[in-house]
UniProtKB/Swiss-Prot annotation:
Keyword Cytoplasm found: yes
Protein name: Translation initiation factor IF-1
MF annotations from Gene Ontology: ribosome binding; rRNA binding; translation initiation factor activity
Family as reported in the entry's similarity comment: Belongs to the IF-1 family.
Keywords assigned: Cytoplasm, Initiation factor, Protein biosynthesis, RNA-binding, rRNA-binding
NCBIfam families listed in its UniProt record: infA
Gene expressing this chain: infA
Keyword Transmembrane helix attributed: no
CDD domains per the UniProt record, alphabetical: S1_IF1
Self-association and partners: Component of the 30S ribosomal translation pre-initiation complex which assembles on the 30S ribosome in the order IF-2 and IF-3, IF-1 and N-formylmethionyl-tRNA(fMet); mRNA recruitment can occur at any time during PIC assembly.
Top-level taxonomic group: Bacteria
Matching Pfam families: eIF-1a
Record organism: Burkholderia thailandensis (strain ATCC 700388 / DSM 13276 / CCUG 48851 / CIP 106301 / E264)
Amino acid sequence: MAKDDVIQMQGEVIENLPNATFRVKLENGHVVLGHISGKMRMHYIRILPGDKVTVELTPYDLSRARIVFRAK
């Protein structure tokens, strides 16, 4: 999949789930299932409920997202 096919949005983590998965509430009100990107796993970046994150959504499945950045 090409990089320009993704949709980037801002959101807030509302719940931790098993296997590095999180429930994220987007700024438009939708709730999606998000998993941590590979680079964030490699650098041991911790994500807690309440953190503001940037997620990437694919146009094919808008209910799942990849967490690519955690704001301070």
